[in-house]
């Protein structure tokens, strides 16, 4: 028996990365998992180096970032890798979720895999928000103020929670210091959740585009899918490098190059682009508590999909109506992202409310109705064929 199978530790690596049997039909959308793993490694590595030079004191936070940019050897590179790495992390994550929605990866027997994935998504957004606050530019300060203030909408205890999180009566030194401590700690918890995600995946294996069991035809992970993953890794690194070296501030906000000033409010307060769809949902509800519930509900409603999708066939590869509904949902989500960065004025308010209503309707009405209708059509088709 080879050492990779007999050794206790190497056998674990072997079962995940070498001999792991994968369905032969999986396409390039299945490469996003390895890209997300790469993003996490890049973020943790660059973050550790940034933490060596960053000061979490509110008086020094902005200046310490400028010190990293100007005085630390290759500090500009580490900072831009970390800042753009966050954006690329979310690009890959949204594509990964989109793949799961399209191919029905959330259906039985992979519900636990899906639940852990949603928890990872929520934790990643929390980590990204706290990291954005640490720069302590104008948008960091006001973004932190607005988002943390949302907790004041919680009945009875909300007004006590907000100063508890701030450590004072506004976003101040204790806020930035505790955000820094959590921003450093939580990625390691995220890495543990990723390991749990892989363990849950390992129980039943990957799904596939066809939507049937992959046991009919499987191939070992190495060398076939390792080399297939390497193709997208190199493409990812090429595009990532283009942003880091040639357009590092495109995905950021120019106001964050102005030191945070509690006395000057920016014309519009917007979070980073990857949080904009949920920010648009928050703003589209006039009531504060209703907006907060809608925003968190928009994320947690992902957990309902294994139960609201009644289809007997996994995935949308052979389902015309489900494909149409999926592409409408994607368009609506992109529309919400655009609305989140626009001023709250006449055409955008109503448009945001319609987009929010459709977002929830997709999960609650569209998916159950279309999946049931397609089941009926499938049954009629099979009965006709039998006759």
Curated annotation (Swiss-Prot):
GO MF annotation, one: ubiquinol-cytochrome-c reductase activity
Binding site for heme b b562: 82, 183
Transmembrane domains' residue ranges: 32-52, 85-105, 116-136, 151-171, 179-199, 225-245, 289-309, 324-344, 350-370
Primary subcellular site in the record, as a coarse category: mitochondrion
Keyword field: Electron transport, Heme, Iron, Membrane, Metal-binding, Mitochondrion, Mitochondrion inner membrane, Respiratory chain, Transmembrane, Transmembrane helix, Transport
Location relative to the cell: Mitochondrion inner membrane
Annotated membrane topology: Multi-pass membrane protein
Summary of the knockout phenotype: Leads to lethality, showing that it is an essential gene.
PANTHER family assigned to the protein according to its UniProt record, in alphabetical order: CYTOCHROME B (PTHR19271:SF16)
Family (UniProt): Belongs to the cytochrome b family.
Name of the protein described by the UniProt record: Cytochrome b
Origin species: Candida albicans (strain SC5314 / ATCC MYA-2876) (Yeast)
Encoding gene (name): COB
């Amino acid at each position: 028996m080879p050492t990779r199978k007999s050794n206790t530790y190497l056998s674990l690596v072997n079962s995940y990365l070498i001999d792991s049997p994968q369905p032969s039909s999986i396409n390039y959308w299945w490469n996003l998992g390895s890209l997300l793993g790469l993003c996490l490694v890049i973020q943790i590595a660059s973050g550790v180096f940034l933490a060596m030079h960053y000061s979490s004191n509110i008086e020094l936070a902005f200046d310490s970032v400028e010190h990293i940019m100007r005085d630390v050897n290759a500090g500009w590179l580490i900072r831009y890798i970390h800042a753009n790495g966050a954006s690329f992390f979310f690009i890959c994550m949204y594509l990964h979720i989109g793949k799961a929605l399209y191919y029905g990866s959330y259906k039985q027997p992979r519900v636990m895999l899906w639940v852990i994935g949603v928890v990872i998504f929520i934790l990643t957004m929390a980590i990204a928000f706290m990291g954005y606050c640490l720069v302590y530019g104008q948008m960091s300060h006001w973004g932190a103020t607005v988002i943390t203030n949302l907790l004041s909408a919680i009945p009875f205890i909300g007004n006590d929670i907000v100063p508890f999180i701030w450590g004072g009566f506004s976003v101040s030194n204790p806020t930035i210091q505790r955000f820094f401590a959590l921003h450093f700690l939580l990625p390691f918890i995220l890495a543990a959740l990723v390991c749990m995600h892989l363990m849950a995946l390992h129980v039943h294996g990957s799904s596939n585009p066809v939507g049937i069991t992959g046991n009919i035809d499987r191939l070992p992970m190495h060398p076939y899918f390792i080399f297939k993953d390497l193709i997208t890794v190199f493409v990812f690194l090429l595009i990532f490098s283009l942003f880091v070296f040639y357009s590092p501030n495109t995905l950021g906000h120019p106001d964050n190059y102005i030191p945070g000033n509690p006395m000057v409010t920016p014309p519009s307060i917007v979070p980073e682009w990857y949080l904009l769809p949920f920010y648009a949902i928050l703003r589209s509800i006039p009531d504060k508590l209703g907006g907060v519930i809608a925003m968190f509900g928009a994320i947690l409603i992902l957990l309902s999909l294994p139960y609201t999708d009644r289809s007997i066939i996994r995935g949308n590869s052979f389902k015309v109506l489900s494909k149409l509904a999926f592409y409408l949902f994607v368009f609506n989500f992109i529309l919400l992202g655009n609305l989140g960065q626009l001023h709250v004025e006449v055409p955008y308010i109503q448009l945001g409310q319609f987009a929010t209503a459709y977002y929830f309707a997709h999960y609650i009405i569209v998916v159950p109705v279309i999946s049931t209708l397609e089941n009926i059509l499938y049954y009629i088709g099979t009965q006709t064929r039998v006759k």
